[in-house]
Amino acid sequence: MVSISASGGYAMPCCCESQELQSSDMETPAVGTPEFDRNVPRICGVCGDRATGFHFNAMTCEGCKGFFRRSMKRKAMFTCPFSGDCKITKDNRRHCQACRLKRCVDIGMMKEFILTDEEVQRKREMILKRKEEEALKESLKPKLSEEQQKVINILLEAHHKTFDTTYSDFNKFRPPVRSKFSSSTATHSSSVVSQDFSSEDSNDVFGSDAFGAFPEPMEPQMFSNLDLSEESDESPSMNIELPHLPMLPHLADLVSYSIQKVIGFAKMIPGFRDLTAEDQIALLKSSAIEVIMLRSNQSFTMEDMSWTCGSNDFKYKVSDVTQAGHSMDLLEPLVKFQVGLKKLNLHEEEHVLLMAICILSPDRPGVQDTSLVESIQDRLSDTLQTYIRCRHPPPGSRLLYAKMIQKLADLRSLNEEHSKQYRCLSFQPEHSMQLTPLVLEVFGNEIS
């Protein structure tokens, strides 16, 4: 006969497996045990059942964990009725407690790892306290309200409706013409869809009741003055001598098209339609070029510092924009702005909120109801700040809101430089005649 003692006394027979599963002692890593592969099934070292982890310094199942804990705490002494070398399995582990306890000791289970009742109670209290702290922390964490989430969803939809990532409409512009000195060349499209660009049609393009006439969703024929009609043979721009600024006609069409899309986006901003038509126009005239610069970041590529809008014909480098009349006084800070904005890695939600905040700026010239504009912008700003705290993980979220607001300040400087260069361009008739009525209306008649 072989006796296995746990410091004297007999333990009551194990009446049911469920009692063993109620063990609450601390699970401990095995002393000196090498790392194991978590993908490999873990087997209890005592009975061969599925193990749940290291318990009291050995890999065991919940049943053997509970059996060892009770045996040690009760100082049980078991006697094997056989030869003392019973094979312990999942099915017979309750038949011989002596050999089962011996097996527990043999695989390295140690009573020193067993918690006292007081330690168990303290552990339970610590766990409960930690859960309560986590619940409190979660409850204090800012959350987007239903209204804020609705605003974000509306802005996302507005952006998707007014920003074509295929850039298919670019084929409707007067074709890009790059001089032989440019680093890139472009071929003309076989069929060119052009616009009637006579400056005589510029009257009342942006009239006070123009907003009510804009169809939704946005379509090419948004403005009566900008009818995109197909020409049978060649564009009117092909009948004149190649201008000194060969890219101006194409980029003028691109900017005109972009203004239309900005107007469409603005109309869907919650609260924008609550403003008077005069204030809507004032906001759009002042912010249009800034929002275009913001939106263009989606096509900006840092690898070669270009704007890629589909095919190579519509891949724009700084040299292309200089051939439309702009100087490095604008382009150098513009590229720097694009790089900085790209590095912020904004979520699309943050991007559309920034565009809306840019448009709804109460300090724009000509705005009458500044308090209403400010209240709309404040709601958008609050939504952006809450979104960053809730959805933008660190470290990218650190000071992100402040960095985004700084980008709006940078846009003001770019806007000012663009206006200066536009005025120089528009004072030259041979260049101003290449501009569209909408471009002339938005950038030409400055609000004082």
Swiss-Prot record:
It is found in: Nucleus; Cytoplasm. SUPFAM superfamilies: Glucocorticoid receptor-like (DNA-binding domain), Nuclear receptor ligand-binding domain. Belongs to the nuclear hormone receptor family. NR1 subfamily. Residues 41-116 bind DNA. A motif (9aaTAD) lies at residues 437-445. GO terms for cellular component: cytoplasm; nucleus. Homodimer in the absence of bound vitamin D3. Heterodimer with RXRA after vitamin D3 binding. Residues 267-285 are annotated as: Interaction with coactivator LXXLL motif. Keywords: Cytoplasm, DNA-binding, Metal-binding, Nucleus, Receptor, Transcription, Transcription regulation, Zinc, Zinc-finger. The keyword Zinc-finger applies. Nuclear receptor for calcitriol, the active form of vitamin D3 which mediates the action of this vitamin on cells. Enters the nucleus upon vitamin D3 binding where it forms heterodimers with the retinoid X receptor/RXR. The VDR-RXR heterodimers bind to specific response elements on DNA and activate the transcription of vitamin D3-responsive target genes. Plays a central role in calcium homeostasis. Also functions as a receptor for the secondary bile acid lithocholic acid (LCA) and its metabolites. This is Vitamin D3 receptor.
